[in-house]
Swiss-Prot record:
An all-trans-polyprenyl diphosphate binds at R96, K176, T177, Q214, K231, K241. Mg(2+) 1 binds at D87, D91. This is Short chain isoprenyl diphosphate synthase. The lineage of its organism: Archaea, Methanobacteriati, Methanobacteriota, Methanomada group, Methanococci. It comes from Methanocaldococcus jannaschii (strain ATCC 43067 / DSM 2661 / JAL-1 / JCM 10045 / NBRC 100440). GO terms for molecular function: metal ion binding; prenyltransferase activity. Mg(2+) 2 binds at D87, D91. Its EC number is 2.5.1.-. It comes from the Archaea.
Length: 327
């Protein structure tokens, strides 16, 4: 019998599946030394496991032998954690998931190596896929996603020097955040022997949840719960991040509010009251972001209609969770 529990107010995560994913992940990092402990620091620090879970439940649209898909699911999560370790170094972040980041605890050189180790272990995981044809397809999807994540991160860093257009920003998040979510679903589809029509529908579903995932991150930074987020609310304002909310605001605000917002954005010495003031200025754009997420979530669920109603429900619920999650 499935044991489900709530996340973000939605009853959808199967504890048995999450446990199997964790057990699979442990087999890749089971040594006890500084390098492996650094690689495990974030991997078992309470992440949501959305990406490997997506791989498994996509696979379960058509198949039931979870053991077959676990190495593929683990590969996705190992890549995800590698990107997080390196992101934290590039962004100079001290905290993630309410804990000190890997480079803070182990130093930058060891953190870089820990990320590299997880990257290599992901391809070890792919090599455990028993069907060679599927392993080859998974390898193609995963390597393409890794390239796009790097391209997206580079774009994000370049945005520090100018204000991107909405189109540029959406392209960046499709790569930086969306690529690995798309890969998670695409890999599940390969492992499930989905046909071309099914794969295309799942690709469109994944594109939309990838977009809503990043937009919700941007929203939560402004109106989320600091304890649940594991980082200070408003940190994107302090850092001057060009989010979809900021880009929309700069297009739609009157000149006085725009001028005031630009004075606060990226000011490292900004006071808490000024952060609150900026959030107040951004409220209409936060609402715009929420409406866009609703639209994309409904579109995502529409693409699932070609699958069995009962089997697709968890993917529909995951789309809702990604939009409504609180951390």
């Amino acid at each position: 019998m499935k044991e489900l529990f709530k996340r973000g107010g939605i009853m959808l995560f199967d504890k048995n599946i999450l446990q199997k994913i964790d057990e699979e992940l442990k087999t890749y990092v089971d040594k006890d030394d500084k390098l492996y402990n650094a690689s495990k620091h974030l991997l078992f620090a309470g992440g949501k496991r959305i990406r490997p879970y997506l791989t498994v439940v996509t696979y379960m649209l058509k198949k039931d032998d979870i053991e077959e898909v676990l190495p593929a699911a683990a590969a996705v999560e190992l890549i995800h954690n590698y990107t997080l370790i390196h992101d934290d170094i590039m962004d100079n972040d001290d905290e993630r998931r309410g804990k000190p980041t890997v480079h803070v605890v182990y130093g930058e050189p060891m953190a870089i190596l820990a990320g590299d180790l997880l990257y290599a272990k992901a391809f070890e995981a792919v090599s455990r896929i028993k069907d060679n044809k599927k392993a080859h397809e998974v390898l193609k999807i995963l390597s393409k996603a890794c390239v796009e994540v790097c391209e997206g991160q580079a774009m994000d860093m370049e945005f520090e020097n100018y204000y991107p257009t909405m189109e540029e920003y959406l392209d960046m998040i499709r790569k930086k955040t969306g690529a690995l979510l798309e890969a998670s679903v695409g890999i599940g589809a390969v492992m499930a022997d989905c046909n071309e029509e099914e794969r295309e529908a799942l690709k469109e579903y994944a594109k939309r949840i990838g977009l809503t995932f990043q937009i919700q991150d941007d929203v939560l930074d402004l109106i989320g719960d600091q304890k649940k987020l594991g980082k200070p609310v408003g940190s994107d304002i302090r850092e001057g991040k060009k989010t979809i909310i900021v880009i929309h605001a700069l297009k739609t605000l009157d000149e006085d509010k725009k001028k005031r917002l630009l004075e606060i954005l990226g000011n490292k010495n900004v006071k808490d009251e000024e952060i609150k003031e900026a959030i107040e200025i951004l409220k209409p754009s936060i609402e715009y972001a929420k409406e866009l997420m609703k639209q994309k979530t409904e579109e995502a669920k529409e693409y699932l209609k070609i699958f069995n109603k009962d089997r697709r429900k968890v993917l529909e619920d995951l789309a809702d969770f990604i939009m409504s999650r609180i951390y």
